Amino acid sequence: MPDKKLLSQVRAIFFRSKEMIVVLSLFFASIVGAAAWQMTRAISTLCDDAALGALDIPLKFSLASFAVFSFLAFEMSYKLRRYKLDECMNTVAHAKRKIFLAQGVIFVVIILIFFAFFNIWSLLLFVKYRNFNCWHGKFIIQTVLNMLLSHFFVPCCAAAMGMSASLLFRRINGCLGLVLFVLLGSPLSNYLG
């Protein structure tokens, strides 16, 4: 586990970076906007499928979260190298691992905030659609597992992939690799071939 001083340095570099804060703020604002739009819409009383379709809207942000967190982690690792933090830590044993862990801790905290918001959004949707046939135990368990996969594990893997790409490749090659990976994982890949 990295020490508190290293964590505070990594956190300070992250919050000092205006472009990363702007991207993260815009991403969270789009999520809050989508949640507010969905919560203010009128409920269709036609069938249970309308409720089930509305309950899976939070899950549609998983690809966007993958892209955002992979590029944020890539830029964060690049900034740490640009500020020569890894070069200063070369005198310490296992310094690169400690920097990688410190950066990972910062991203896990951000991802946990992201994950908590999506869980609150899903809970509010379940309350909104309480009169529909969506309170089955199996459906709730499936929704929780999907939320865990889509909004915790996918962003964590994206952050780890972005940090690793920054360590392995130069800036342009790493960004192009991440763009290619995001495109291949998106629905656009169906139209590429």
Language model features with spans:
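Helix-loop-helix units of permease transmembrane domains in multi-pass membrane transporters
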Residues: 74-110
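Secretory targeting signals
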Residues: 29, 35-75, 101-174
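Aromatic- and glycine-rich beta-strand/loop motifs that create alpha-glucan
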Residues: 1-26
